Each structure stands twice: as structure tokens, then as C-alpha cells.
């Protein structure tokens, strides 16, 4: 469709110098297959060249692909809660610190900071905010003890910019 639009613009006497493909370059949080940005650019350049638009400068905003891995949220397990249905690690960090899991159901890697002799159990990692949606990760196998330190990695994209003082919590 873009090539059709470029052809219509050219037919109307409008020649562009740049073409901006915006953002949306993927990030591998878990086991997704993310096309390397080089492949995307080479593919775009090839299609533009084949269609007679090789003069266009390609502009892209790499966004999350640059900053996601540059940040992590460090938190401490405050309590271990066990119910007949599920086990929970309640941390001192919550949805006000990292909203993406609660808001978008974003899968974020969670790793223990130290090696532990504690048994590893399937947990939901949740925060201290009085909201049922205050969770950082679901169904993770982690050490089960108060005082454990956890790192929620890949939090550089929108982690700080979307953090808030919701529910009178400090940043």
C-alpha cells in the first residue's frame, strides 16, 4: 500500500525526500522471534529500489529495541503468601513502579539476584498496592523466602517514564 501511495504522489508531482516508518521495532522479552533491524532496513531498501524510490532516506525510531535492556527494577520479597490455589511473592515494588505488566499484561523476565538454597516454587510476583491488578509477573519458578532480592529485567523501555506516585507510593 505504501508503494501505491508513493506512486500516486509521484504522479501528482510530489516527490518525497524521506520516508518515516515510525517505531515498533520489536524486543525479545521471552521467546519471541524478533527480526533484526538490519534485516528490516535491507528489506525496505530493496523494495523501494525495485520500485524506483531508491532516493528516499529511510527514517525509523528504534524505541524499545535500544532501551529495554538498559533498565531493571530491583525489588525485595516482603512476604510469601500461600493459598489453596496459588502462591504469591509480595514485593516492595508494584504497578506504580512498573506499570507494563498490569496495564498491558506484558511478560517481563524476573530473576533472583542471589543464589538461594530455598526451594523454587511456582509463584505470581505481586506488589504492595491495594489493587488486584498489582502484579509484576505470573507463574514464575523462583526461590520462596522473604528477603530474597529479585530483578525484573528489560524494564528500561517506559519503566521510569510511566512510573507514578499512585496510592501515595514513593518512586
PLM features per residue range, with description:
Residues 1-2, 37:
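Aromatic/hydrophobic pocket-lining residues that form the small-molecule binding cavity
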Residues 2-9, 43-47:
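Short, well-ordered amphipathic alpha-helical segments that serve as non-catalytic structural scaffolds
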Residues 12-17, 54-56:
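Short, well-ordered coil/turn segments that N-cap beta-strands
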Residues 30-35:
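Short, solvent-exposed loop/turn segments at secondary-structure boundaries
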Amino acid at each position: 500500500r505504501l508503494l501505491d501511495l508513493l506512486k500516486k504522489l509521484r504522479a501528482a508531482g510530489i516527490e518525497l525526500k524521506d520516508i518515516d516508518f515510525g517505531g515498533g521495532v520489536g524486543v525479545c522479552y521471552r521467546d519471541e522471534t524478533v527480526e533484526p533491524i538490519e534485516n528490516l532496513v535491507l528489506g525496505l531498501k530493496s523494495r523501494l529500489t525495485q520500485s524506483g524510490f531508491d532516493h528516499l532516506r529511510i527514517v525509523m525510531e528504534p524505541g524499545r529495541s535500544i532501551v529495554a535492556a538498559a533498565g531493571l527494577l530491583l525489588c525485595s520479597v516482603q512476604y510469601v503468601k500461600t493459598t489453596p490455589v496459588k502462591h504469591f511473592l509480595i514485593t516492595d515494588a508494584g504497578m506504580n513502579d512498573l506499570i507494563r505488566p498490569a496495564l498491558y499484561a506484558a511478560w517481563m523476565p524476573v530473576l533472583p539476584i542471589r543464589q538461594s538454597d530455598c526451594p523454587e516454587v511456582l509463584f505470581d510476583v505481586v506488589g504492595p498496592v491495594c489493587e488486584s491488578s498489582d502484579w509484576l509477573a505470573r507463574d514464575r519458578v523462583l526461590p520462596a523466602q522473604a528477603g530474597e532480592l529479585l530483578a525484573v529485567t528489560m524494564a528500561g523501555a517506559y519503566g521510569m517514564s510511566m512510573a507514578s506516585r499512585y496510592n501515595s507510593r514513593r518512586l
